[in-house]
Amino acid sequence: MAERANDIRPGQVLEHNGGLFLVVGIMHTQPGKGGAYIQAEMKNIKTGAKHYERFRSDATIRRAILDEEEYVYLFTEGNIVNLMHPSNYEQITINLDLLGEKKIYLQDNMKIKVVAYQDKIISAHVPDYVTLAVKETESVIKGQTATASYKPAILENGMRVNVPQFIKEEDKIVVYTPDDSYYERVKE
């Protein structure tokens, strides 16, 4: 879809120089001399490389039309992830690498967002918030809770997260997946 460069927003995907680029950030600049332009920080979807591009405000850009579908995680076999569409039960497979480092969060029946461009899957995403049990953590030492402090914990999937002092082993916590941080304790 053709648009003016002035309408570029972070989070959009552009077709540019024969590739797909995710707009990470933009800056509108109006120099004292010459026309206004947009400096866009973009990330190549295929390679992950960052790229900076300058567009004139009145230039025409092409925004990619993406299809997003939610699938349910079934199982992983080797480097292949098997997913099922929740309404028509169609099963698809994707490469585990599409999830990147977030593959550690995969759980049975988890909803996975799959993004396709021209019927080719280009990315997959786990939910922003995932509930996990604390497998191992240090016990609280009395008097150590006067200030807000964190302690390391190992979760059921093997990852390490810093959690507040009141978290005990077997507690369930919510992890914010974009930055792999503690979000809250699950109230039972």
From Swiss-Prot:
Pathway it works in: Protein biosynthesis; polypeptide chain elongation
CDD domains reported for this sequence: S1_EF-P_repeat_2 (cd05794)
SUPFAM superfamilies in UniProt: Nucleic acid-binding proteins (SSF50249), Translation proteins SH3-like domain (SSF50104)
Classification via Pfam families: EFP (PF01132), EFP_N (PF08207), Elong-fact-P_C (PF09285)
InterPro entries per record: Elong-fact-P_C, NA-bd_OB-fold, Rib_uL2_dom2, Transl_elong_fac_P/YeiP, Transl_elong_KOW-like, Transl_elong_P/YeiP_cen, Transl_elongation_fac_P, Translation_prot_SH3-like_sf
Places the protein is found: Cytoplasm
Membrane spanning stretches: none
The keyword Kinase is annotated on this UniProt entry: no
Annotated GO CC locations: cytoplasm
Keyword line: Cytoplasm, Elongation factor, Protein biosynthesis
Keyword set includes Metal-binding: no
A GO BP annotation: peptide biosynthetic process
MF (Gene Ontology): translation elongation factor activity
Role played: Involved in peptide bond synthesis. Stimulates efficient translation and peptide-bond synthesis on native or reconstituted 70S ribosomes in vitro. Probably functions indirectly by altering the affinity of the ribosome for aminoacyl-tRNA, thus increasing their reactivity as acceptors for peptidyl transferase.
Protein family membership: Belongs to the elongation factor P family.
Listed name of the protein: Elongation factor P
Taxonomic classification: Bacteria, Pseudomonadati, Pseudomonadota, Alphaproteobacteria, Rickettsiales
Gene assigned in the entry: efp
